[in-house]
Amino acid sequence: MENTYKIQKIGKVNAENGIYSIQLDKQFIPGLTNISGFKYLQVVWWGHLYDTPQNRASLIIDKPYKKCPDKLGVFGTRSEIRPNPILITTIQVMQIDMEAGKIYTPYIDAETGTDILDIKPYHMLERIKDCDVPDWCQHWPKWYEEAGDFDWADEFNF
């Protein structure tokens, strides 16, 4: 028996002229009550640009990163190509316009118009002190704050 789920969007991504924001739909704006004080949020979004039957059936990806093995299972990647294109990004909060329901961030790796499914606060307790990763990605930044200066273009094969 197949389970189905009803998911509704709560807002959309805006990325215009180098300004990134999340605009909540009006009925979800009260969900921002007392969220100020969190410097980082986790944003759950739908990878609509890759939501095809073929991509949903892809479980093995051919060398998405230059230094990874020739084949990599989709669950070992953060690729949009996956059985359910549900993606998560941690964003830095620059400003929250509570009245408008708008969250400003320096960057989010989602396109304008991307549906937002959920927003959660990023808590310090989610950090992992002893985090191990495969050798092929050991050289990646260890901290979010270092990732902006990293040459990601030299890592990807797409």
Task: Outline where the language-model segments fall.
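Cys-His-centered catalytic/binding microenvironment captured across papain-like cysteine peptidases
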Residues: 1-88, 95-158
